[in-house]
Curated annotation (Swiss-Prot):
Keywords: ADP-ribosylation, ANK repeat, Chromosome, Cytoplasm, Glycosyltransferase, Golgi apparatus, Hydroxylation, Membrane, Metal-binding, NAD, Nucleotidyltransferase, Nucleus, Repeat, Telomere, Transferase, Ubl conjugation, Wnt signaling pathway, Zinc. It is an enzyme of class 2 (transferase). This is Poly [ADP-ribose] polymerase tankyrase-2. Residues 873-936 form the SAM domain. It comes from Mus musculus. SMART domains: ANK (SM00248), SAM (SM00454). Residues 545-553 are annotated as: HIF1AN-binding.
Length: 1166
């Protein structure tokens, strides 16, 4: 082996005895070894390019260049005739040398120029042996990729793997970078995969997981290109993973149609079963992969096979439609297969009226096509049986082949006779523009040609390639067809053509026969009578010719059909007739002009419209690459819009061009999509670009107000994002979902809040938008706010937090008189006589300072919900206060002296000592506890005490026995009315269940209200015109904290951007969840919910001088000289009065009423 090892490095050993070589040859060898391309170019001649180193190993220049890795020199030598298979003394070819020294690029170059990857030297060493021995991993991979055989043994019986360096063994076992290979197949990294792929690892299995092969992963992840490459390089379509799944299972489970098709075309078994006996069809059907199911069935998948649970694919189909489709297509494919095999028994088993015209989903073949092509003797019987059952004689495949085409091509003359007798069109054209005669002539079927000619097949029809049947046949066929052609053109034919051109119906009727109806103008353009009649607008002639067998698909020598002629000259009636008789609207002439190209170029608007209505494709290009739109003249804007179709409507909606929208829109396209962009509808664009009139027109004509684009946005999202208040209001009017979410769970309120759209936020909230909804990031609209006013608005709309509450103070007998509370709540001089509530409500405007003092003495008690001890003789709150300080032993002193909490607030060390509290520590504890109680903190414990500073809101619970409670309840119940909307907004009810009535105490709001009341009174002759009115709003929580805020009012209200009140509680009840009832209660989304609690405000409202109004009028402020607007009932106007103020401080929320509406007796659900 020592001699052979020297041979392996032949290039290195070649210098020995070089002096014996002629100088020019020696110089060439040296230049090749050193990589001196310029010298090589000077020295190489055709005679010297394969010269030998006679003093050494008989190496050629290519041996030297390859061994030393001189790629440029190798490339030049190969281009100039170097022999890639030349052997030196040891039998080595240049490839051996390049592989031995690891020159991968040179190896690749030599292999591309035909070097044998399995060439053997004198010791049977291959290039792979050389690379493996030296551990040249890259070279091993290149050799294996080019067909190197790893099992070849040298003269010692050793393979490349036996001799391989440890670093190269993994390549030869298929384990080299296996994980990277599998990952590249999964991720679709072609370059990475091809750098690692060899025949030894193409079917490697993952070491963990499901033991998948690269093909399993590529199929499951829909890597179409990777699948193609793997299959090309020998991937096993039958390879199974740990669960016995084949790659086809993966592709079908995920619905990857192209991958499935590739696998079945490469022999994948469509009925392969995994360990649980699931077939690929089980996988596809259970996941509702409809198209994949159809594909599998067309390749023989059986939907009746049962898995281990005794379930078939049909059983696993999730929808009735898919179950039905699986059964139907299985029967259909069974019928097609029986027809191919001409099996009468099976045909009868599967044949029915429903199945007789079943089409193969991919090829569009019918059973009649299959029978016509069948080589079996009973095909004629099968065809007759199918035709008796109603098979369509002229049905076409995907390539436009009729059964007559198929039978003619196969010389099945018996079938030709049968289908012609059943009215087969003998001149029907396939996708190449060929008749049955073309196909028979091309195949040299002389008898078939003769038979077709006898049935009137036209030998002069020119195919799309410009050939007649005569030109496609052999000598015998040509002779036969020449005779038929000369017989076919007579004087009568010429007269018929002239009559059709002139519109002479009588002459046409006289001359027209079955043989002559499709005669040709031989001397001219090969036109038929129908071509002439269509081009010259001879409507009656066209009608007659079509009724008597004229071929609507006949082409002249330019490839024009009659429809081209009619469209080019704008003959609408003729074009309509031709289309009704089956003319193909997308047929193309030799220059690939369709009828639509003709009509568009000539400015024929109505013709274009007709063609488009019947499926003409406006994207088809002629030979110059022009679509019909490209050929329209600049002035024909109507045709341009027509051809642009949906794109034109979308553009018009975007630009706000109402006239164009009206012209272009129809029920079919009003919800069309921007397929090149975000899949927006016209309404999305109109809403986003603030085109109010366009939006309104689209909504009136069927636009889907809640249509989602690609990102899940509805038009309201767009309007909200860009702050288009009027458009948003219009969308809401047409029932846009105010809480609709996009793919990232953003609502319109998120959009408006993020962009600082205050008015839009107010509008959305007023119509039931939920401010608590979170997007995928967990953010509410409030979290996205940047503007302070929007932040305030959203904060106000958030669900009510726990407010401090207390029961209305009630002093026990012997402490205060029974009228103490009423006195504290009564007004100074007198109550306004205009208040509409019961008389006890007329005394509610008393001194707020007195009220606060009373509240402070009972707040802590009310906050805990504990009941007062009726027999204690003292306010329970002082008892709780003393107990929390740990001074219970002092209770006797407080009871004896009748010290209540409000009295204690005024006492100091001196007063406490006088009543008998002598210990300084006790007095200090009491005084500090009181200080904390009034310092603004909240809680039972004096060290975390109730806010009584006057800056916040306190709710006083009224007892049901209290006259105040009863008066408010009476006002609520007595003002319920039946509304025109039948309860749509506020629910169906006739009374309430009053759960709670709370008095709202807020010193700041009260002072603001009284100040404004005084101003109004002074401006209105000392008459404030104060009323007690109801107000419904989703902002109740904000109102009782901050008062009414006119900044958030919506201008779209009946009387503009004001704050609305009603004297009827049922009227205000319509607004508790938003305008028009919003979206109903938060939990059930029901406007007539009888379970959820509602809240209504009974407010003190200063109307001052009110402006009477009977019809809608948009106002941002009250009319000059007035303080409010009163909407009076009128015919076709309001049914119940409404009161509107335009300044928030003109109303004070006096009572918060919590209630339920009650279902009327006898009312049935739904």
């Amino acid at each position: 082996m020592s001699g052979r090892r020297c041979a392996g490095g032949g290039a290195a050993c070649a210098s020995a005895g070089a002096e014996a070589v002629e100088p020019s040859a020696r110089e060439l060898f040296e230049a090749c070894r050193n990589g001196d391309v310029e010298r090589v170019k000077r020295l190489v001649t055709p005679e010297k390019v394969n010269s030998r180193d006679t003093a050494g190993r008989k190496s050629t220049p290519l041996h030297f260049a390859a061994g030393f890795g001189r790629k440029d020199v190798v490339e030049y030598l190969l281009q100039n005739g170097a022999n890639v298979q030349a052997r030196d003394d040891g039998g080595l070819i240049p490839l051996h040398n390049a592989c031995s020294f690891g020159h991968a690029e040179v190896v690749n170059l030599l292999l591309q120029h035909g070097a044998d990857p399995n060439a053997r030297d004198n010791w049977n060493y291959t290039p792979l042996h050389e690379a493996a021995i030296k551990g040249k991993i890259d070279v091993c991979i290149v050799l294996l990729q080019h067909g190197a055989e790893p099992t070849i043994r040298n003269t010692d019986g050793r393979t490349a793997l036996d001799l391989a360096d440890p670093s190269a063994k993994a390549v030869l076992t298929g384990d080299y970078k296996k994980d990277e290979l599998l990952e590249s197949a999964r991720s679709g990294n072609e370059e990475k995969m091809m750098a690692l792929l060899t025949p030894l690892n193409v079917n490697c299995h993952a070491s963990d997981g499901r033991k998948s092969t690269p093909l399993h992963l590529a199929a499951g992840y829909n890597r179409v290109k990777i699948v193609q490459l793997l299959l090309h390089h020998g991937a096993d379509v039958h390879a199974k993973d740990k669960g016995d799944l084949v790659p086809l299972h993966n592709a079908c489970s995920y619905g990857h149609y192209e991958v499935t098709e590739l696998l079945v075309k490469h022999g994948a078994c469509v009925n392969a079963m995994d360990l649980w006996q699931f077939t690929p069809l089980h996988e596809a059907a259970s996941k509702n992969r409809i198209e994949v199911c159809s594909l599998l069935l067309s390749y023989g998948a059986d939907p009746t096979l049962l898995n281990c649970h005794n379930k078939s694919a049909i059983d696993l189909a999730p929808t009735a439609q898919l179950k039905e489709r699986l059964s139907y297509e299985f029967k259909g494919h069974s019928l097609l297969q029986a027809a191919r095999e001409a099996d009468v028994t099976r045909i009868k088993k599967h044949l029915s009226l429903e199945m007789v015209n079943f089409k193969h989903p991919q090829t569009h073949e019918t059973a009649l096509h299959c029978a016509a092509a069948s080589p079996y003797p009973k095909r004629k019987q099968i065809c007759e049986l199918l035709l008796r059952k109603g098979a369509n004689t002229n049905e076409k495949t995907k390539e436009f082949l009729t059964p007559l085409h198929v039978a003619s091509e196969n010389a099945h003359n018996d079938v030709v006779e049968v289908v012609v007798k059943h009215e087969a069109k003998v001149n029907a054209l396939d996708s190449l523009g060929q008749t049955s005669l073309h196909r028979a002539a091309h195949c040299g079927h002389l008898q078939t040609c003769r038979l077709l000619l006898s049935y009137g097949c036209d030998p002069n029809i020119i195919s799309l390639q410009g050939f007649t049947a005569l030109q496609m046949g052999n000598e015998n066929v040509q002779q036969l067809l020449q005779e038929g052609a000369s017989l076919g053109h007579s004087e009568a034919d010429r007269q018929l053509l002239e009559a059709a051109k002139a519109g002479d119906v009588e002459t046409v009727k006289k001359l027209c026969t079955v043989q002559s109806v499709n005669c040709r103008d031989i001397e001219g353009r090969q036109s038929t009578p129908l071509h002439f009649a269509a081009g010259y607008n001879r409507v009656s002639v066209v009608e007659y010719l079509l009724q008597h067998g004229a071929d609507v698909h006949a082409k002249d020598k330019g490839g024009l059909v009659p429809l081209h002629n009619a469209c080019s000259y704008g003959h609408y009636e003729v074009a309509e007739l031709l289309v009704k008789h089956g003319a193909v609207v997308n047929v193309a002439d030799l220059w690939k002009f369709t009828p639509l190209h003709e009509a568009a170029a000539k400015g024929k608007y109505e013709i274009c419209k007709l063609l488009l209505q019947h499926g003409a494709d406006p994207t088809k290009k002629n030979r110059d690459g022009n679509t019909p739109l490209d050929l329209v003249k600049d002035g024909d804007t109507d045709i341009q819009d027509l051809l642009r179709g949906d794109a034109a409507l979308l553009d018009a909606a975007k630009k706000g061009c109402l006239a164009r929208v009206k012209k272009l829109s129809s029920p079919d396209n009003v919800n069309c999509r921007d397929t090149q962009g975000r899949h927006s509808t016209p309404l999305h664009l109109a809403a986003g670009y603030n085109n109010l009139e366009v939006a309104e027109y689209l909504l009136q004509h069927g636009a889907d107000v809640n249509a989602q684009d690609k990102g899940g946005l509805i038009p309201l999202h767009n309007a909200a994002s860009y702050g288009h208040v009027d458009v948003a209001a219009l969308l809401i009017k047409y029932n846009a979902c105010v809480n609709a979410t996009d793919k990232w769970a953003f609502t319109p309120l998120h959009e408006a809040a993020q962009k600082g759209r205050t008015q839009l936020c107010a509008l959305l909230l007023a119509h039931g938008a939920d401010p608590t909804l979170k997007n995928q990031e967990g953010q509410t609209p409030l979290d996205l706010v940047s503007a302070d006013d929007v932040s305030a608005l959203l904060t106000a709309a958030m669900p009510p937090s726990a407010l401090p509450t207390c029961y209305k103070p009630q002093v026990l007998s012997g402490v205060r008189g029974p009228g103490a509370t009423a006195d504290a709540l009564s007004s100074g001089p007198s109550s306004p006589s205009s208040l509409s509530a019961a008389s006890s409500l007329d005394n509610l405007s008393g001194s707020f300072s007195e009220l606060s003092a009373v509240v402070s003495s009972s707040a802590a008690e009310g906050a805990t919900g504990l009941q007062r001890k009726e027999d204690s003789g003292i306010d329970f709150s002082i008892t709780q206060f003393i107990r929390n300080l740990g001074l219970e032993h002092l209770m006797d002193i407080f009871e004896r002296e009748q010290i209540t909490l409000d009295v204690l607030v005024e006492m100091g060390h001196k007063e406490l000592k006088e009543i008998g509290i002598n210990a300084y520590g006790h007095r200090h504890k009491l005084i500090k506890g009181v200080e904390r109680l009034i310092s603004g903190q909240q809680g039972l414990n004096p060290y975390l005490t109730l806010n009584n500073s006057g800056s916040g809101t306190i709710l006083i619970d009224l007892s049901p026995d209290d006259k105040e409670f009863q008066s408010v309840e009476e006002e609520m119940q007595s003002t319920v009315r039946e509304h025109r909307d039948g309860g749509h907004a506020g629910g169906v009810f006739n009374r309430y269940n009053i759960l709670k009535i709370q008095k709202v105490c807020n010193k700041k709001l009260w002072e603001r209200y009284t100040h404004r009341r005084k101003e109004v009174s002074e401006e209105n002759h000392n008459h404030a015109n104060e009323r007690m009115l109801f107000h419904g709003s989703p902002f109740v929580n904000a109102i009782i904290h901050k008062g009414f805020d006119e900044r958030h009012a919506y201008i779209g209200g009946m009387f503009g951007a004001g704050i609305y009140f009603a004297e009827n509680s049922s009227k205000s009840n319509q607004y508790v969840y938003g305008i028009g009832g919003g979206t109903g209660c938060p939990i059930h989304k029901d406007r007539s919910c009888y379970i959820c609690h509602r809240q209504l405000l009974f407010c003190r409202v200063t109307l001052g001088k009110s402006f009477l109004q009977f019809s809608a009028m948009k106002m941002a402020h009250s009319p000059p000289g007035h303080h409010s607007v009163t909407g009076r009932p009128s015919v076709n106007g309001l049914a119940l009065a409404e009161y509107v103020i335009y300044r928030g401080e003109q109303a004070y929320p006096e009572y918060l009423i919590t209630y339920q509406i009650v279902r009327p007796e006898g009312m049935v659900d739904g």
